[in-house]
Amino acid sequence: MAQEEEDVRDYNLTEEQKATKDKYPPVNRKYEYLDHTADVQLHAWGDTLEEAFEQCAMAMFGYMTDTGTVEPLRTVEVETQGDDLQSLLFHFLDEWLYKFSADEYFIPREVKVLNIDQKNFKLRSIGWGEEFSLSKHPQGTEVKAITYSAMQVYNEEKPEVFFVIIDI
């Protein structure tokens, strides 16, 4: 498992972006990006299933911008369900991507899972953040879609581990 560390990608932050980032404590990062032909594979993990879901969402958003420059000015909730853990993960990420790209242009600084019903595969989550603005948030790479391709969910032992390929 990769070490927990800060995102070391160079976003060429402005002084204003650096000041925003320095205002808040860093969010725990338990994910990494793995190369995949023409796409990117998110590798996220957590001590609990909830944390693995949270880290996977933040890995997706972290690919689009430096989430450290996001201020927690408002909240957005996402409720989703699936037929199994893989489809629940797919729909969870897809709903959060919708909040960013098609609905509210919402970018979270942090996502927390409030409840997972593992029997019925339902999930409630909340994100703290703000509307994405190119003048405030450095532009990373746009995520076009979540895919089922090579999706893996390991939740039989700790840590919980997810692998998800995102279409960029």
UniProtKB/Swiss-Prot annotation:
Q: Which GO terms describe its molecular function?
A: metal ion binding
**Cellular component per GO, a single term:** tRNA-splicing ligase complex
Protein's UniProt keywords contain Membrane: no
Which positions form S-S bridges?
none
Sites where the protein binds Ca(2+): D39, D167, I168
Subunit-level organization? Component of the tRNA-splicing ligase complex.
Q: What is this protein called?
A: Protein archease
Q: Which organism is it from?
A: Mus musculus
Biological classification of the source:
Eukaryota, Metazoa, Chordata, Craniata, Vertebrata
State the encoding gene: Zbtb8os
